[in-house]
Structures are given as C-alpha cells and as structure tokens.
Amino acid sequence: MYKTKLSKEPIIKFGQNEWKIRGGVAEAGKDYCFQPVTVYSNSDSVQLIHNNVVYNAEVKDYIARFSIPFTNGLNKLKATSTFQTETYNDLLKIDFRLAPNQFSEFDDDFDELNVLLGTKRIYEDRINSMIWIPEQEYVQGSWGYIGGKPYRAKTKFGSLPSSELNIKGSQDDPIYQTQRVGINGFKLDVPNGKYSITLHWTELESNIKHEKLAYNLGNDRIFEGSSSRIFNVILNGEYIEKNLNISEKYGVEKAVSVKYQISVNDGEGIKINFESVKGLPILNAFQIRKIH
C-alpha cells in the first residue's frame, strides 16, 4: 500500500496475489462462496471483472474492496482503472476449492475436504497444492465437529489462539498448531461410496521448554506438563483406535496422521466418535477424499 501511496505513476495491483489457491464453504443453496478481494490503486475507482461479471468499487485509502462469489475451479479476475485517458489492468487467476454446504446439493461433484480444527484460519499448502479450511459445527445434511472447544495455549497474560511450536515430522505446522479439545465427534452426511479418511493429531501439552520467540516476548507460554490423555476412536460403530495415548505412542509435539478407508451404504454417512478413557480427546485436523 505504501508503494501505491507514494507512487506518482498509475498503479493497480491485486492484494495477496500470491494466494493462488483458495477455499471455502458454499453459501446455503448456492454453488459459490463469497470471499473478499482487495485491489491497490491510486485512482478514484476500480472496475473488477470476475468470470465475465462486472463489479465497481470506490478507492478508499488506496484500496478498493470487493466481495466476490467464487465458484468451484478456475476463477479469472481482471482489475481495471483509468488514469486520464489511459487504462491500466491487473490479472489474477485463483483455483477455488468449494466445500459443500449440503452434500445433497453437490451430487457427484464432491472429491475432498481438508479441515483445520479449533481455528477460523485458512491455510494454503502450496507444495501439495492443497487448501485447508476452518472447522464448522455439524448441522444435518452437512459436515462438522460435535462438541469440544478450541485449544488455547496458556500464557502469563491470558492465552493464545494457537500453539507457536515447531511440530516435528511435518513441514506444515499450521495443520497441527490448533486443535479441538474435548471433541465428541465429527460427522459428514456424505453420499454412498468409498472414502479415505485421515485423522491428524499432535499432543501440544508438554514439559519441553523452548527458546522465547522474539515476536512473543512478554506473553510467554505457561508449561503445564505432558498430557496423559487416553481415548478411543469409533468409525461408524467400529473401534478403529482403542486406548490411544498420543504422547506415549508417538511422543509430544510430533505430527501424527492415520489413514482409514470406509464404504458408506444405505445413506448412513460417516460418523466418528471420540470416547474418553482418561482426560479429553483431541483432534487437530481432518481429511476426507472420495475414492473413485
């Protein structure tokens, strides 16, 4: 924005233009998801064309703001401003991964879903061309968590919405730095078919002390010791994990991902139950892919 403000030359540039893959949940009854798009410009107004639909916005403080209905797949955007008699453009292509609101509205279009638990943030894994979207609570016909609350890392002055730990065994720390604690279940009303499911865990509570981070000085984490939580995992009535103790089996601050396959018949969907043996069950992230 500072470059736009100080420049004497005409400027028009999409904000966050390095964010090539996006994702979100479809609006109820629709085949699109509204997300914000910003355009930096030192003109008075900006015209934005998205998939051949024209939008206009005034520039305020060198930013034009739009709310765009992204559809599944490739979305083409063109921003245009006029300076005196000259027209200037910027182009952006976004691969949008639309997640179902109601599975019945997706028919056979559903392929995959990657969900971060205990957070509202989105994470783009550029290496694997994958987008992770935030959790939502389950409602009938859709998907989401049942019960629990987001993990909060305790500090001297309150808490943080995620862990700052470097997670061993993964290059994608954001997948494991948040979790839902005390989760009762995760349910998806998917159509009949074969699916691959991956559950991601990390034990974030440990007695390992780390070097203080420069950006976090004064808000130091309080270490409460390793958790000895033990729980069972039940997939559509079948135990797939019994007496799972993550810290004992895998260690703390380590990425754990376990994959399962399931066939869904008779419209039963998928339901994962977490059954406490000791302490509170957790889930950091969830993935599902349809096997074609």
Task: Give the label of every model feature segment.
Residues 97-292:
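Compositionally biased, intrinsically disordered or flexible polar/acidic segments
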Residues 1-111, 116, 121-125, 158, ...:
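Substrate-binding clefts and catalytic carboxylate motifs of secreted carbohydrate-active enzymes
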